[in-house]
Amino acid sequence: MRIVSLLPSATEMVHALGLGSDLVGVTHECDFPLGVEELPHLTSTLLPEGASSSEIDVLVRERLKTDGALYELDLEELKNLEPDLIVTQALCDVCAVAESEVQAAACSLPNTPAILNLEPETLAEVFDALRQLGSVTGIPDHAEDVIGVLTRRVDTVVSRSQAVQKRHKVAFLEWLDPLFSCGHWTPELVEMAGGIERLGQVGQPSRTLDWMEVIAWQPEVIFIACCGFDLPRTLEELSGSSGISCWPELPAVESGRV
């Protein structure tokens, strides 16, 4: 089978199921596991290079209002790769090529490939996404084995975290200007690991915050995971954040747990 992944997490899922040799194309953001970046890239961003967090936010909001694209899909390369299956998502048009664009592209190919849309909002649904991928690729039993291994790992973490005497208040931030909480399964992961996350909601999208909400929450641990940014870029954005003056008021900063 010839598989094209239009989502970094889907690329990892394909490999988790042992189907890496079937992968023929990925996105410009796929970088794990090692070696996938050598595969043909089928996407590129339409956002200007070097734009700040606030500038990116404005551009994204404007384009979503007008149904404008955030990514470009290389139709010619897609045609050359002749995929049997395209794995994508319809959960968030900010995170990847819009599902409607993928559907139109697939229909334009000489041999229309199957499309698998992944839309998990909770950890259980992430495992269901693996199950769907295993089913469509003809290895449902192996997918169940992989899910079993992952489930046992989660159970081990939960079991150990229950022994923690103090559960720390956590702020998990997905964007800095404006501030965004975490969402979907991330608050769930924090709770499973022994933290308390109340700025984001399990199964719900991330939402905009203001610094007063963060200060009122008084987080003892802060995770910063800006969507699409690597560590150096995240640190750069943090140093220029409008809320940096509020940091001394946060317990997590005082204890160095950021």
Residue ranges of predicted features:
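N-terminal ligand-binding lobe of clamshell/alpha-beta domains
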Residues: M1-V258
